[in-house]
Design a protein with these regions (language model features):
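Short, acidic loop-to-helix structural element flanking the phosphoryl-transfer center
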Residues: 2, 7, 81-113
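A short, structured active-site edge motif that brings together acidic residues
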Residues: 40-44, 67-73, 132-137
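Active-site neighborhood of HAD-like aspartate-dependent phosphohydrolases
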Residues: 1-44, 56-57
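Short beta->alpha linker loops
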Residues: 20, 47, 91-95, 117-118
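An amphipathic alpha-helix signature
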Residues: 22-26, 48-49, 53, 72, ...
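Metal-dependent phosphoesterase signature
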Residues: 56-98
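Substrate-recognition/cap helix-loop segment adjacent to the acidic, metal-dependent catalytic center
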Residues: 30-32, 55, 59, 101-112, ...
Length: 137
């Protein structure tokens, strides 16, 4: 019987991926529009779709679900391409691996994520530091 469900945030709680995630956003937007954004929106505390919508505003583009979806697909591809760079510029947050490993051994606890990242990117960031093995995603 599961008695506790623990939901973890990823960015800043379990891992820090350096500027790889932000760079993937920049590249995804440029892939779709053929030009870079004039600036990067504040990303902290937002979901990936929210960030995409802010990029659309910066780009002066109309917000369409089709466009949001295209950018999110490119974001997924761009982060996957950069996955091997994440460990070099980022890190697992102190204590994250130890607490997740300990909780994984408790049959009354399930650890998962509640994050603003799209699901594939959540896995990429966690896997970069081997944390995905202790979470039910």
């Amino acid at each position: 019987v599961i008695r506790r469900l623990l939901l973890w945030d990823i960015d800043g709680t379990l891992v820090r991926a350096g500027q790889i995630g932000a760079g993937a956003f920049d590249l995804a937007v440029a892939d779709v529009f053929g030009r870079p954004a004039a600036r990067r929106p504040v990303m902290s505390g937002k979901t990936d779709p929210q960030i995409v919508r802010e990029y659309l505003g910066i780009m002066g583009e109309t917000e369409r679900e089709e466009t949001v979806g295209m950018i999110l697909r490119r974001l997924e591809a761009r982060l996957a391409e950069a996955a091997d760079q994440i460990p070099a510029v980022g890190h697992a947050c102190p204590g994250a691996a130890a607490v997740l490993e300990r909780l994984a051994g408790d049959p009354e606890v399930v650890s998962s994520c509640l994050t603003g990242n799209i699901a594939p990117n959540a896995v990429v960031k966690l896997a970069a530091f081997g944390l995905d093995r202790w979470l039910q995603l």
